[in-house]
Design a protein with these regions (language model features):
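Bacterial N-terminal signal peptides
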Residues: 1-11
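Low-complexity, Ser/Thr/Pro/Gly-enriched N-terminal "stalk/linker" regions
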Residues: 13-85, 96-131, 135, 186, ...
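Sec/Tat-exported extracytoplasmic proteins
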Residues: 56, 95-98, 114, 118, ...
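Aromatic-rich carbohydrate-recognition surfaces in CAZymes
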Residues: 80-87, 134-160
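Solenoid-repeat scaffolds in large eukaryotic assemblies
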Residues: 90, 102-103, 164, 171
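Aromatic- and glycine-enriched pocket-lining scaffold segments that form the walls
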Residues: 153-210
């Protein structure tokens, strides 16, 4: 996956000792670049990240596949399926690489094949589908929902909401649906509202742990 590839970059570095920051990026409005802090130039870091991105999305061992007119999916190659974790992670990568075209294609696939539009799981996404869009399971996996919301809010701030997809509205729809769920129909918020932690799954069993 993209995250595994990035982990390899980290492993290949010989970093200097890094000091933790006292304040996070939300407060400082500045993201730290630990690769630059480790002694690499910004140009080297950008080139390496671009190389990994191109390999994972377009290389011979890619996980990204474009289908139909304007859709795409990120495949779990080992299990030969499409999972909300991979799709939402793919959206996070796309928005951070400023690839609106990729982001929109992945999200359209999610909307068409994965997102529930009615019933107790409305707003949530079926966690696993076949590559043709047929659902392997109906239930959601909470980390996918969390990354969907985060990626959509990033996209709203980067590209605005009048360029084809209203990203903020889509994020709010997921959140509004989540906060309307109280477990009475066997489905909860994907965040445990007591402990303020992501749940394993938002059903009554997985809601108890992260």
């Amino acid at each position: 996956t993209v995250l595994s590839a990035v982990a390899l970059i980290v492993a290949s570095c010989a970093p200097k000792g890094l000091e933790p920051w006292d304040r996070g990026a939300f407060e400082t409005r500045e993201y730290r670049n630990v690769f630059v802090e480790a002694g690499y130039s910004p140009e080297e870091v950008d080139a390496k990240l671009q190389s990994v991105f191109e390999e994972v999305f377009f290389g011979p061992d890619k996980v990204y596949f474009e289908v139909e007119d304007s859709l795409a999916y990120v495949s779990d190659i080992k299990n030969q399926d499409v999972r909300t974790e991979g799709m939402s992670y793919g959206m996070m990568v796309a928005v951070q690489m400023d690839r609106k075209d990729i982001f929109d294609k992945i999200f359209r696939w999610c909307k068409k094949y994965m997102q529930h539009t009615e019933g107790p799981m409305e707003g949530y996404f079926a966690w696993s589908c076949k590559t043709d869009g047929t659902r392997n399971a109906q239930g959601p996996a909470s980390d996918g929902e969390l990354y969907y919301v985060t990626a959509l809010l990033f996209a709203s701030n980067r590209w605005g909401d009048d360029t084809g997809i209203d990203y903020k509205r889509e994020a709010r729809y997921i959140l509004d649906c989540a906060f309307a769920k109280d477990g009475s129909e066997g489905v909860n918020n994907f965040i445990n509202t007591e402990h303020k932690l992501i749940t394993f799954t938002p059903d009554n069993f997985g809601y108890r742990f992260t």
